[in-house]
Amino acid sequence: ILIVDDQRPNLDLMEQLLAREGLHNVLSSTEPLRTLDLFNSFEPDLVILDLHMPAFDGFAVLEQLNRRIPANDYLPILVLTADATRDTRLRALALGARDFISKPLDALETMLRIWNLLETRALYKALRELIPSQQIELLRQHRPAAGPA
C-alpha cells in the first residue's frame, strides 16, 4: 500500500490503522512529487492519496498515475480529503479514484473500504488473464470525462 499525504500525522494515523489490521507492507510519503517514482519501484496494490497538497496536488497525481496504469490492470486509488464537495468527488472519480473518504476519517469505515479495495484488486489480478486487454480499454474509453456538473 502506498500512502501519499503532505501531513506526517495523517500518514502516521493511516500506518497505525493498517498495522492494526496486519497490513505492514506500506510505504508512505509526504512528497507528492515522488509518488510516481515510489509507485514504479513499489508496485502497490492500493494507493491512498490526499487530494489537497501544496505545489503538486492529488488531482495531478491521479492524472499521472492514470497514464502509468496499463489497460489490462486495475489499481484501486482511495482518495482522502477534507473537501468533500460534489465537484471534488466527481473530479477525483473521473480521474481514476475508485473510492473517496472525507476527513476526519472514521477508522472502521476507512478500514472496510480499504479491505474492499484490496479484495477487488486481488480478484482482478486473478481474473485479468481471462479478459483481453482490448475489452478493458473499451470500458475505459466509455468512462465519462471530468468536467463541471
Predicted regions and their residues:
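Two-component/phosphorelay signaling modules centered on CheY-like receiver
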Residues: 8-27
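C-terminal output helix
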Residues: 104-114, 118, 122
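Active-site residues of response regulator receiver
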Residues: 5, 50, 81
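Alpha4 helix (beta4-alpha4-beta5 surface) of REC/receiver domains from two-component response regulators
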Residues: 15-16, 41, 60, 73, ...
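Acidic catalytic/metal-coordinating carboxylates
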Residues: 30-31, 57-63, 135
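Acidic, metal-coordinating helix/loop segments flanking the phosphotransfer/catalytic sites
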Residues: 28-46
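Short amphipathic alpha-helix used as the core "switch/output" element in two-component signaling
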Residues: 37, 59-72
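The feature encodes the CheY-like receiver
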Residues: 54-57, 81, 85, 103
